[in-house]
Structures are given as C-alpha cells and as structure tokens.
C-alpha cells in the first residue's frame, strides 16, 4: 500500500498571475491537503472519503482521480489494477489548489506503487495536463508547488517546468476560506481579453521586483510589490466582503494580502505571530460566510507532496 499526502497551495500570490505559487502547511500541524491511497487489487476501484467527499462528482469517470489512473495507465501502456482511496479534505473551488491536491496525490501514489517509472519532470507535466481538464487550461502554479514544495516560479522553457524561489521564514500566511465556491473557469472568464500597456508594464515591474527582492532577501520590498493589476480588479466582484477584509487586515498589520488562486480564499501575509492571530480572528468573525468556511495560519510547505505510508 502507498499513501501520499499533497498540500494546499496558494497560486498567483497577487504579483504572479499563472506563474507563481506556494505550497502551504498549517502551523498547528493540521494536514491541509488531500490524501490518496493505492493498493494492488484484481480490478480497479475508487473510494471517496473525507470532509468534502460529498462534493465530488457522483459519476466515477468524472472524478479526477479516476482520470489520473486512466492517463497513468495510458502513459505506461498497460492496465494497472488497483484499489484507490481519495481522502478529500480540500473544499472544491476554494482557491487553495483543491484539484491540484487530488491530481498530485493520485499520480504520485500511482508512480510510487509502480516503482517510479516516470521522473519528476514527466510526472509534473502529466499533473499539469490533468489539472487543466478541470481549470480549462494547463498552468502549473498549483501543481508545481503542491508536488515540489516551497514557492515555485513557472519557467516552461528548456525542459524546465518550474524552479523554486527562496521564500521568507518570517512570513505567516493567514488563509481564510469563506465557505462559498468560485469556479476557476468562471473566474478566468471574467478577465479581459486585452490589457492596457500601463498595466502590462506595472505587472512586469512588480513581478521582476518581487523575484529580485526574494533573492536579495529584502522582505519589506517583496511584500510591498505583491500587487495585482491583472486579476484582482476584476475578480473581487465575485467575492463578497473581500475589499473590506483587505482594508481591515492591512489596518491590523498584514504586510500584504490578496486573492488566493481564483478565490474565494483570501490570503494575508504577516511577519509577527500575534499579528497573524489577530488577522485570523478578524477574518474568522467577518469573512467566513457559513459552517464550511475556515481560517488557517500557515507557513510555506517546503516538502511538497510526500509519502505517508509505503
């Protein structure tokens, strides 16, 4: 039996639309991510467990884990009879890389079960392909950090899909999921087809400056450059209370904040534990909309997806 855990991730990070993402893990030790188990069997089967299992498609072939198994078998050129279990701990349409968690855990578990026939680059390419079936286009800003850990910059040149960017140990990521769903496809459809030249220049300046600040260890500068002129101005209308929440967390002391992925989760970066706790408390009282919502104080997950049992 192989059991693989794949962590949540926060894509875009305001400054890097479709090209930046970070894996995150709660500081209290909770597992914020999906778990997939693979066992040898006579025929294929898939069982769904976990807090959000009831939100998965009722038709098994529509389940992304089934599609991962099917595509992996196709890649190897043979049917691999296994019993798979998906522990769905991540809310769907949350902006925390929920589909990436399932895809990464499923493909990594299959690869481990079969003795690692695929290298990490090929495996990551498959992960992007499968996750793209749900989001509508192939982009690696969730699957790359989820699989590899840390903060990842998408390269997609010279046979390199992504490379790690140094993060800041001081940063605490407060992630608030309000409990409502925003589909990635809907959030992408709301974006303009063309952008003004001044917005393109600002975006390039912010992203280049942010990467430079990370490598030159300028924490304050990096946080100041986390601005979004590409997606947030258009997507915030999908998120009730988002603008007020951003203003409130800034007043409490967050050094940066924005939409995690395509939303509705809000991320707020803090450089002090007491500030992070006060931000988390405010968001818990004011940004959450129902019982499915949650707030976690996280750090970068530098390990990425990992085998829990083998």
Curated annotation (Swiss-Prot):
Q: Which family does it belong to?
A: Belongs to the GHMP kinase family. Homoserine kinase subfamily.
Q: Which GO terms describe its cellular component?
A: cytoplasm
In which residues is ATP bound? 91-101
Q: What is its EC number?
A: 2.7.1.39
Q: Name one GO molecular function term.
A: homoserine kinase activity
Give the protein's recorded name: Homoserine kinase
- Is Plastid one of the keywords? no
- Which keywords fit this entry according to its UniProt record? Amino-acid biosynthesis, ATP-binding, Cytoplasm, Kinase, Nucleotide-binding, Threonine biosynthesis, Transferase
One Pfam family in the UniProt entry: GHMP_kinases_N
Top EC group: transferase
For this protein, the record's Gene3D superfamilies field holds:
3.30.230.10, GHMP kinase, C-terminal domain (3.30.70.890)
Single biological process term from Gene Ontology:
threonine biosynthetic process
Pathway where this protein functions: Amino-acid biosynthesis; L-threonine biosynthesis; L-threonine from L-aspartate: step 4/5
- Principal place of residence: cytoplasm
Q: Which reaction does it catalyse?
A: L-homoserine + ATP = O-phospho-L-homoserine + ADP + H(+)
Indicate where this protein resides in the cell: Cytoplasm
* Protein role: Catalyzes the ATP-dependent phosphorylation of L-homoserine to L-homoserine phosphate.
- Gene this protein is translated from: thrB
Output the PROSITE patterns linked to this UniProt entry: GHMP_KINASES_ATP
Family matches, as InterPro entries: GHMP_kinase_C_dom (IPR013750), GHMP_kinase_C_sf (IPR036554), GHMP_kinase_N_dom (IPR006204), GHMP_knse_ATP-bd_CS (IPR006203), Homoserine_kinase (IPR000870), Ribosomal_Su5_D2-typ_SF (IPR020568), Ribsml_uS5_D2-typ_fold_subgr (IPR014721)
